[in-house]
Amino acid sequence: MTPTIDDDAGHTPLRVFDSVKALAFIGDLSMGQPTDHSLRTGWLAARLAEAAGIDATACDTVREASMLRWSGCTANAAGFADVFGDDITSRVAMLEGRVDWIEPLEALGGVAAVLAPLAQIHCEVSGEIARMLGLAPATETALRHIFETWDGNGLPARLEKATVPVPVYVIGLAGDLEVFARTYGVERALGLLAQRADTRYPTRFVDTAARHAPSWLTELDQLSPADLDAALTTSRMQQATSAELIADVIDLKLPWMTGFSRAVAATAAAGCARLTPDEAAHRRVYRAGLIHGIGRAAVPNNVWNMARGLPPSAWEKVRLVPYWTWRAGQQAGALGEAAELASHAYERLDGSGYFRAARNAALSLEARILAASVVWVALRSARPWRAAFSADAAAKQLRDEAASGRLDGHAVEAVLGDGAAVARRAPSGTSQGARLSAREIDVLRAISRGASNKEVAQELALSPSTVRTHVESVFRKLECSTRAVATLRASAMGLL
């Protein structure tokens, strides 16, 4: 019998602040930005809020929402890829305000028509993340309207002027200042902000930023990571949380990866339990499994969706995935130990892995178990270009890898032990899940993997209209309007 792993127990406590910083890191990678972009934006936003005379409670909202502003980016990455081809470079062009970034949208009905559904996904997911982390309701509200503008041309609800939460204006301006100053220099950045006065955000905030921006940016460049942490944390972000939400946000980037990180974590913990009674080791490998895919956000979806061998340029991006996971741990406090272990997920005993090309003795037992678990879960999962391997075929593949000296034989047998049953963390919110019928859960699982209503109908032998009815019922019962949030909630309830 395999153990049930609780990420809340036995670790260095994971604060909400640590989780928020990890999610900020993922968001920055998704947007093609430096990995301190969201933290710097948060600091600038807090200074702007204080200088503008905004009350202390709203200043805390600014701090929390600014770091989670891009937390919905993995959820709509597939949509950006469908429109632009490369979901990351297109976002860089958007943030930098390049005049040509909207050209592909004109033939598709215009900016609003194309971006409205993508903004809806992003805002609903980031708001849901704030709710799941226990942050203030005002933070959730700000994130659900993070792309609204002063002139009413924002998204998703086209709010305007005083109906837009004030933190949205502050965060939007601070984010623009951070990007523009870094890209074009301070003087031009202030000119670009002035052009957006009373369209994107109120003139009074632009005027305040213009007075202080040069000194703020100079001060910001001199701050240590500890200084940034002290300036950005709030009382709600001191609460304890677990790493499962990070795993779920990671996996939203590619619908066919839904549940992958949790499955790797559970498989690794179960395999570890077969090799050592050390419960601390079980928990370490479990948390590492949850976050091992953080760096995946740095690679465009069109690379991940390639059915054939990757060209060298794409392969180089993939090889850096565990590096970015390791870097996230340096920024995210209590996740440091887990990220160090997680960054070994793709190493191999013969030195053919990445990113370190580590060998033999350099790889701990936990690293070997994690590597075998990633391979096992990947083989047993369907991909757009292939069906899932059968248990026997996947087991043979793992044993062949061990025989060739790439994977550890003991780790492989531990992962395959007892029919490779995996542990599952006790789900939360089961009362919500109990309201869904068995057929609704079937439909929910299918749409969480990215299946269209037509594909779900074929898979479950239902009519498209029946599937649509089930989807509408699922959304109503889960109180959401997007598949991404339905997936987050279903995963938290243990339904996937």
Each language-model region and where it sits:
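Histidine- and acidic-residue-rich, metal-dependent catalytic cores
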Residues: 2-435
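DNA-binding alpha-helical recognition surfaces that contact promoter or target DNA
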Residues: 191, 207-208, 396, 445, ...
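Short, locally clustered residues in the helix-turn-helix/winged-helix DNA-binding domain
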Residues: 251, 445-449, 491
